[in-house]
Amino acid sequence: MIGGLGMPELIIILVIILIIFGAGKLPEIGSGIGKGIKNFKKATRDAELNEGDKDDKEKEQEKLDK
């Protein structure tokens, strides 16, 4: 169960998506969603690394100021 949705609800949603977009468009949509998730994860990871770099630089600056 995902977010309060059971298997019957997920099947109904999948059928509606198939009707709206058609079977031919589904691989393109899936690929686009996958790329979006990958880019989001990369941006999050980069932001965390940059945050860590800022903390390290601030600590070094504090040591130099003493």
Curated annotation (Swiss-Prot):
Bilayer topology: Single-pass membrane protein
InterPro entries: TatA/B/E, TatA/E
Organism superkingdom: Bacteria
Subcellular location, record wording: Cell inner membrane
Membrane-spanning ranges: 1-21
A biological process term (GO) from this entry: protein transport by the Tat complex
One protein family per Pfam: TatA_B_E
Keywords, in A-Z order: Cell inner membrane, Cell membrane, Membrane, Protein transport, Translocation, Transmembrane, Transmembrane helix, Transport
Region annotation (Disordered) ranges: 45-66
Molecular function GO labels: protein transmembrane transporter activity
Major subcellular location class: membrane
GO cellular component: TAT protein transport complex
Record's subunit section: The Tat system comprises two distinct complexes: a TatABC complex, containing multiple copies of TatA, TatB and TatC subunits, and a separate TatA complex, containing only TatA subunits. Substrates initially bind to the TatABC complex, which probably triggers association of the separate TatA complex to form the active translocon.
PANTHER family assigned: SEC-INDEPENDENT PROTEIN TRANSLOCASE PROTEIN TATA (PTHR42982:SF1)
Function of the molecule: Part of the twin-arginine translocation (Tat) system that transports large folded proteins containing a characteristic twin-arginine motif in their signal peptide across membranes. TatA could form the protein-conducting channel of the Tat system.
Family classification: Belongs to the TatA/E family.
Protein name: Sec-independent protein translocase protein TatA
